[in-house]
């Protein structure tokens, strides 16, 4: 029984890790990581800083709109341009960013 629980936990963690890798690959393929680092900001803020700022807030839909349409004024003078992503991709990216610790 204990081994079944352990295997289930390991399988769940590997699936979560695969999802996170796929989400990071999406961010990379869409050019997001050219301006945003995970740990450190480049032109835009670091994704971990974004996750920390919005922790516990219900802002995923609002942030996804900013990813699609662009926006500024929250992190300094440089506005984020509109991005060539679908609304579904934007939601996936935002959920990934907000999950970072």
Named regions from a protein language model:
Residues 5, 24, 64:
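Short glycine-/small-residue-rich flexible loop motifs, especially phosphate/cofactor-binding loops
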Residues 21-38:
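Sequence/structural segment immediately N-terminal to covalent heme-attachment motifs in c-type
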Residues 2-10:
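Sec-dependent signal peptide recognition
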Residues 15-18:
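N-terminal signal peptide c-region/cleavage motif recognized by signal peptidases
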Residues 34, 42-52, 66-95, 100:
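Axial heme c-ligation environment in periplasmic c-type cytochrome domains
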Residues 53, 57-58, 62-65:
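Post-signal/leader-peptide non-cytosolic segments of secretory proteins
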Residues 1, 21-24, 101:
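Absolute protein N-terminus
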């Amino acid at each position: 029984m204990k081994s079944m629980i352990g295997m289930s936990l390991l399988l769940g963690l590997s699936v979560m890790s695969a999802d996170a890798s796929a989400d990071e690959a999406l961010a990379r393929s869409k050019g997001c990581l050219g301006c945003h680092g995970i740990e450190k900001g480049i032109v835009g803020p670091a994704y971990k800083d974004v996750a920390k700022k919005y922790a516990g807030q219900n802002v995923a839909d609002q942030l996804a709109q900013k990813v699609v349409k662009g926006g500024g004024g929250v992190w300094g003078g440089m506005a984020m341009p509109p991005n060539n992503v679908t609304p579904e991709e934007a939601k996936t990216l935002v959920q990934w960013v907000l999950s970072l610790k």
